Amino acid sequence: MSVCTQCGMCTNSGGNTDRLPSLFDSIGPIMTGPSSSHTAGMVRIGRMCRQLIGGTPDTIDLYFYGALSMTYKGHASDSGVVAGLLGQLEDSPGIKMALQAARAQGIPVVVHRYPDDTSHSPATVDTELTRNGERYRIVGLTIGGGEIQMSEVDGFPVELYGSEDGVLFSASKAYAAAELSAAVGATFQSCVSTVNDGVYFHTAISDRSLSEDAMAKLKLLASKVYPLAGLWDFKLVNAEPLVNSFDELLARAKASSIPAVAEEFEAKRSGVTREWIRKKTLGAWKTMKASVVAGLGKNNLVAGFMPGDDGAKLMKLVNKGKNLSGPIVGTAVARAIGVMEANGSMCCVCASPTAGSCGVVPGCLLTSAEQLHSSEDQIIDALLVAAMTGVLIAKRAPVSGALGGCQSEIGVASAMAAAGLVQLAGGTPLQCCEAMALALKNILGLICDPVAGPVEIPCIKRNAIGVGNAYVAADMALADIRSVIPPDEVVDALINTQQLLPRELRGTLIGGLASTKTARQLKDVWYKRMEEMG
């Protein structure tokens, strides 16, 4: 197979075992909708830029490429970057008003669009910023589920994911970690440099952000300094994974359970305690439940074309006992649709693993937890199984529709939910993994073909099929029906399918439903609305 070079997706989905997601990259981030990649991810890129330039910028220029240059308004991507630059967090309700906030502070924001560009990843945001007379150019990418990678700072390549502490700086010579540590009075684990035209650009990583004294000493050595501090309350402290595969997960779970292995995995990865992990998981669960309530409240005003009350309509039918799929699946689907409508209305949701699929896991687990009268600890265990499932997939394959099709979002969410349902029902570790495999392979090939731009058509209703598929897979696994293709090989198949999927079917508004007459008409309406929104 020839590998396309247009967006980097083939490289990103090639089984990158160097990348080690957290459990809370799978059930997280907790965020304001509508897109984990193009809203929450953009906030995080904005936060990184703010940190690197040392505070709020004086001017902001944003560059969007390819499909994102036409969908960014529906995803609130421009608002997201600006919100981050102003110091807001991913779950801030002020994201939707960030452009107005910048204007009120006298900060000009200019968006540059390049829809025909194929030289950049469609998940790229390129920023040009000024602060206190200094100019900066910083480039970042969203890589799925709210995760980010900063790729360039002032023309120099970098590889930063948002959890690092330390500093970037330019100097007239190269510094090794030991030399730099002695010079500034801080301890650096690593210091690597690249050179261009006699300028040495350094990435110096420490276990904590630099003190004011160390920063002052560094400024005497450097021509330009970019502060670096981790963005969230956990970080990668050990890149050696506890388990690499579902086979290894099962082998380790024989002596305990998948939830216990998940806790051990995160404790090793992030240097946190079991109590911290369970408390943070409970926080994700509370957000999920709140998003269900918000979604069925019939007060949602989605950004684009949907009415915002389809979940409530289905719930009404279920409550009357008139739906065909029964009370459990019907309720779970109604809740999933409602959560997605809340997401489209820029309410707070928990990406699981993405915002575009954030209805599947809460719809399934809340409904079955009520059915089974599950305790809080049992629900946390089920979420840990779902999260561990997501980690082992995301470790090797992108969880982004723009990078791998909707199979990467709804497919992975359905697999996570199926595994969590089996855990909730008292299933074995093997049954949990089989449920994952059965669910994921049923949705292989699902394309990403959004209509016009907002995270609505077909995203909202595709969460419904993710729910139905999760229940079917969970029931089969609980009956000891096995996937002939083993779980890890099903992930291999996902990667293969992602690589073969053409860019026209990966969120570019070209193929699938986006090619229909109605979709083209809605696209024209949306683009006109975009022009009016500036």
Language model features with spans:
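Helix-rich "cap/lid" substructures immediately adjacent to catalytic or cofactor-binding pockets
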Residues: 325, 329-345, 367-396
